[in-house]
Amino acid sequence: MTDERHVLVIFPHPDDETFSSAGTLASYIQKGTPVTYACLTLGQMGRNLGDPPFATRESLPSIRERELEEACKVIGITDLRKMGLRDKTVEFEPYEHIDGMIKSLIDDTNPSLIISFYPGYAVHPDHEATADAVIRTVERIPKEERPRLTLVAFSNDATEALGEPDIQNDITDFKELKIKAFEAHASQTGPFLKQLASPEIDGKQHSFLTVEPYWTYHFKS
C-alpha cells in the first residue's frame, strides 16, 4: 500500500466505506496516515429496516447516523464529516453546490489520495453523482497539484470495460475488523452478514473480505 500524506474518502452513504474500503482505511490509519471520511448523506432512504426489523422510516436516519459513527470507530476514522445532503437526491444537487463542497474538502485536507466511486461503473444514482462530482472537481485542479484518484467500481461490466483493477489491497489482516464494521451497520447488513456466515460462502464473497480492489483514474489532460 502506498505512503500517503492524507487520504480523503468521499462516498454518499453510510456503509459505502465499509463495503469498499474498511480494510484499506484501517491499514492507512494503522500506519499513521491521516484519513478524512466525507459521507454526503445519512442514508435516510435505506432499503432495509433491520433483519428482523428494528427501525421505522422515521427512526432510520438517526439509527444510520449512529451506525456510521460506530463503523468509523471500528475502522479507526476520527475525522468524519457529515455533509448534510439527502439520500437519493445527490444526482439533483446543483453542480456548483456539490463541486464546491468537494473543493472545500480538498482545500481543507490537502489529500495526496482520494478514494471514491468510478463514474459509469458504480450502479446507484447517488454513487454515480458522487463520482461525477469528484472527477469534475479534481479535473479543475492544475495537473501537477491533483491528488491521485483510486476508485471503486462494482457494476457487472466494470472489469470488462476497465480491465483488471490495478490496485488490489490485501486486507487479510483486517478481515475481522471489516466484519465488525459491517455489524455496526446492522440496519442494512443483516442479510449480507448471514451470507458471509454461511458454510456455503463462495469464493467471490470470501475474497471480498481479503482483497479490496481499486482502479486508478487517469485524466485525459
Where are these regions (language model features)?
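Metal-dependent de-N-acetylase/amidase catalytic core
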Residues: M1-L8, K31, D79, K88, ...
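Active-site rim/loop-helix segments in enzyme catalytic domains that contact anionic ligands
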Residues: M1-T109, E139-E145
